[in-house]
Amino acid sequence: MPILMITYGIQYSDKITLSSSVAFDLRQDTHLVGNEFAWLSTGFYLAYLIAELPFGWVMQKFPMEKVISYTVLGWGICVFGLAACNNFTQLMAIRTLLGILEAPISPGFLIIVTAWYKREEQLLRSMMFFSMNSFFSLFILMANYGVGKAAIGSKIESWRAIHLFLGAVSFLWGIILYFTLCAPKSARWLSQGEKTLAHARLVSNKTGESTSGIKFKWNQLWECFVDPQIYFIMLTTILKSSASGGFSTFSTIILQSFNLNTEQTIVYQLPWYAIQFVSVCVVSYVVNTYPGKNLNLIMAFTLLLPAVVGIFLEALLNNDHLWGRLVGFWITGFYTPASFIIWSTTGLNVAGRTKKSCAQAITFMAFCAGYCIGPQMFYASSAPQYRPGLYFCSACFFTAELLIAVWYVWVRWENRRRDKKAEAQGLTLEQRNLEGCLLGLQDITDRENPHFRYRY
């Protein structure tokens, strides 16, 4: 888990560096005009989206841990390259390549978690590495500020120094990752007997193998496109990512519109990331304390409520109500754990190795689509407060809430339908569990396994 957590934190640090660099005159030094800054974010996530399905296939065919290690080394080099950019074209090219190389990280990590942990353990572990987004952000923001301030007056611009610093960190960690990241079957520090035990404890998951080298099954790919659950995950992810993508990309610029200086802009972002981290920790505690309870969708719905309120405050208040806007800005951070809960659902509720890979890819393609759409709603003509973009974010969060409510009703209905069918066959609970486990070992999907029950 520490390996996944550190890697995920470094990955997100690279993403937020673009926003941090705005405070140190990246737009002015690279002569960005109009919506070009928004396109730097959109281009990254468009490349991320296109690369998802190919990487899903690559990680099923080749050792996943090595694929991820090579991409981390590659993105470290890309972050170095950003420091050498002088115009929009160069920035766009490097950001696009960076998007391709970061594509396998989130879906790959979710599959690695399912390869090591039981279903009741997976959400907590997923939240642990997802929480590094906000935890690392707290320190990276301060580190970026320190590096940027130290570079003032030197021969190199502050934002270039920030990218050199993070590029070095990413590349060095990629080397460490190559020798440490592993699945149970390839773990050098496990004996053959321990590897067998690690596999045996996951039989009750009923989700099949989560390792590389398993045959790609076209029927499981097709099932992804006819499963209502995949559409719930995809649509909810697009809506939330459209809102969070636009808001997070322009967060620094929105804060600057409060007439804050560089130091204040950095400092006032810290409570936002702190709220994200603390709320993820609270969700993790609840999940760990009540592992058998179906609280996932209820928590996601509840956590989106303050985000809806926060975005409305941002959109409706003017700068005469500075603290009202700041509070609105900060409480939008509650959307973060809601997103992580939705993403983790693919590991919990999707069975079959090919279907799981495709579901992960579709989920993060939806995530990327949202992050492509969101920044484009923040028109340069509406700067610096971007009210149309904020109204768009509000509508997306509100619609996502409605969709989660419908999803919750559907999952409960589907589980009850399966229970009634099993009872009609005269099967006891023990018989259902045993047959479900045996079927799960055959790499069949959740829809093919009548004894699979969905978490919600």
Predicted regions and their residues:
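Helix-breaking motifs and short loop linkers at transmembrane-helix boundaries and internal kinks
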Residues: 14, 30-31, 54, 62-63, ...
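Structural signature of the two symmetry-related core transmembrane helices
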Residues: 66-80, 297-312
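Helix-to-loop junctions at the C-terminal end of transmembrane segments
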Residues: 50-63, 278-295
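Glycine-rich segments within core transmembrane alpha-helices of 12-TM secondary carriers
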Residues: 123-158, 163-170, 360-374
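Conserved MFS/SLC helix-loop-helix module at the cytosolic interface between two early adjacent transmembrane helices
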Residues: 49-91
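Extracytoplasmic gate region of multi-pass secondary transporters
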Residues: 19-20, 216-285, 339, 343, ...
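Extracytoplasmic
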Residues: 2-34, 50, 55, 105, ...
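Intracellular terminal tails of multi-pass secondary transporters
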Residues: 1-13, 19, 24, 34, ...
